[in-house]
UniProtKB/Swiss-Prot annotation:
UniProt keyword Lipid biosynthesis, yes or no: no
Cell cycle as UniProt keyword: yes
Protein name per Swiss-Prot or TrEMBL: Probable septum site-determining protein MinC
Function noted in UniProt: Cell division inhibitor that blocks the formation of polar Z ring septums. Rapidly oscillates between the poles of the cell to destabilize FtsZ filaments that have formed before they mature into polar Z rings. Prevents FtsZ polymerization.
Keywords attached to this entry: Cell cycle, Cell division, Septation
């Protein structure tokens, strides 16, 4: 059985509540995601570990077909649950405003110049990122920063920093993911990041 919840569009949460028959599950998933209301959404997929690798691959193919991209919820121990909780901000952050949270942060709006977002986990901005974004501040160098338009003043993941000049801040027009690769913070199109992008829900 599949449960779909709209956190606040364009973000939806899909939870696989029980394994059951894989063909029936895939059919149900396809039918639900085919509705126009979900078109172009970012999907948070919870409980994918109940599926076999080949079943999971089929689910991922459907998610890629019907969504902007997807993020897998990560199963955590009880001691980490509180600090890894997802914080959702349903507004644009103006200059001088600051959001800080020990877990993951989802911004349903823009982060304007001179606004700051600080997270112990990952940061997702469903809009323009023009301010400062610092992820993985509890020492997590596997954290990522996602934005529909990436034009930041400064990016930080763990202890690694990337300061961007005005000339470097022109977004290519598609969603990007910032992550650590080697000794540097690199940007990649979000379409190529589904396999490693994880949210600590």
């Amino acid at each position: 059985m599949i449960e779909i919840k709209g956190k606040t569009l364009p973000v939806i949460q899909i939870k696989i509540k029980e394994k059951g028959n894989i063909d029936k599950l895939l059919k149900e998933l396809k039918e639900k995601l085919s509705h126009n209301i979900f078109k172009g959404s970012l999907i948070i997929l919870e409980n994918p570990e109940v599926l076999k690798p080949e079943e999971r691959k089929k689910v991922e193919e459907i998610l890629k077909e019907f969504s902007r991209g997807f993020i897998e919820g990560k199963k955590e121990g009880k001691e980490k649950r509180e600090e890894s909780r997802l914080l959702i901000i349903e507004r644009t952050l103006r200059a001088g405003q600051r959001i800080e949270h020990r877990g993951d942060i989802l911004i349903l709006g823009d982060v304007n110049k001179d606004a700051e977002v600080l997270a112990g986990g990952n940061i997702i901005v469903m809009g323009k990122l023009r301010g400062v974004a610092k992820a993985g501040l509890i020492g997590d160098h596997s954290a990522v920063i996602v934005a529909l338009k990436m034009e930041p003043q400064l990016l930080q993941i763990g202890k690694k920093k990337a300061i961007m000049s005005e000339a470097d801040r022109n977004s290519p027009g598609y969603p990007e993911v910032a992550k650590i690769e080697g000794e540097d913070i690199v940007l990649e199109p979000i379409e190529g990041a589904e396999r490693w992008l994880k949210l600590l829900l």
